[in-house]
């Protein structure tokens, strides 16, 4: 198991949930935190603890993006019209690495980020290596010729546990971003609570 895979599954164990819905997640066998004392960590959490956990889970789901980036998204969401929590989800789902993952071009959000950073992803025909770039409705996301032949792309497209969301139109290795989704439309394997993230940052 690679170091990145180990870190990913460590997050699953810490949360006690199968964050990405992967069959090989260790929490499918046990539902407690990592380490020899993981089973002892249950108990009533404070409001702060609940809010922090919600933030860690949402941030971790998107490849454990940095706190700086995540808070920047929150601040932008809070300045937009409408519900801040819904706005935050919309911004996260507009990230280029998230779109590559949602389109089933890669099996994990981590490999999606790597594919982007290595210059294998194009937005409207122009190469883009910025994983945090926000796409907009109507944008077309495609893979370069070299990426189209990668085994991980074929693996991702064959994964039965992941469905294509309705806010993406996907044809092979081409995806069109149709619209910004609401929380209910995003196919999270676990419950996400952006309202608690808003409460965390509003303290």
Curated annotation (Swiss-Prot):
The organism sits in which domain of life? Bacteria
**What GO CC terms are in its UniProt record?**
small ribosomal subunit
Domain spans labelled S4 RNA-binding: 94-157
Q: Name one Pfam family in it.
A: S4
Q: Fetch the InterPro entries from UniProt.
A: Ribosomal_uS4, Ribosomal_uS4_bac-type, Ribosomal_uS4_CS, Ribosomal_uS4_N, S4_RNA-bd, S4_RNA-bd_sf
- UniProt cross-references to SMART domains, sorted A to Z: Ribosomal_S4 (SM01390), S4 (SM00363)
Keyword vocabulary terms for this entry? Ribonucleoprotein, Ribosomal protein, RNA-binding, rRNA-binding
Q: How does it assemble?
A: Part of the 30S ribosomal subunit. Contacts protein S5. The interaction surface between S4 and S5 is involved in control of translational fidelity.
What is the name attached to this protein's record? Small ribosomal subunit protein uS4
Tell me what organism the protein belongs to. Sphingopyxis alaskensis (strain DSM 13593 / LMG 18877 / RB2256) (Sphingomonas alaskensis)
User: Gene for this protein?
Assistant: rpsD
């Amino acid at each position: 198991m690679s170091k990145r895979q180990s870190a990913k599954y460590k997050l699953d164990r810490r949360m006690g949930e199968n964050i990405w819905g992967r069959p090989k997640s260790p929490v499918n066998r046990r539902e407690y935190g990592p380490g020899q004392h993981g089973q002892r960590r249950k108990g009533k959490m404070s409001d702060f603890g609940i809010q922090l956990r919600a933030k860690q889970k949402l941030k971790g789901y998107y490849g454990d993006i940095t706190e700086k980036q995540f808070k920047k998204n929150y601040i932008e969401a809070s300045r937009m019209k409408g519900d801040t929590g819904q706005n935050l989800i919309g911004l996260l789902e507009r990230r280029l690495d998230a779109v590559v993952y949602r389109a089933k071009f890669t099996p994990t959000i981590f490999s999606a980020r790597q594919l982007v950073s290595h210059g294998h992803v194009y937005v409207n025909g122009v190469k883009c290596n910025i994983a945090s770039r926000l796409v907009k409705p109507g944008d077309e996301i495609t893979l370069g010729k070299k990426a189209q032949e990668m085994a991980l792309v074929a693996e991702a497209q064959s994964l039965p546990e992941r469905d294509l969301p309705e806010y993406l139109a996907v044809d092979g290795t081409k995806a069109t971003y149709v619209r910004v989704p609401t929380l209910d439309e995003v196919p999270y394997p676990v419950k996400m609570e952006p309202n608690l993230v808003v409460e965390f940052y509003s303290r």
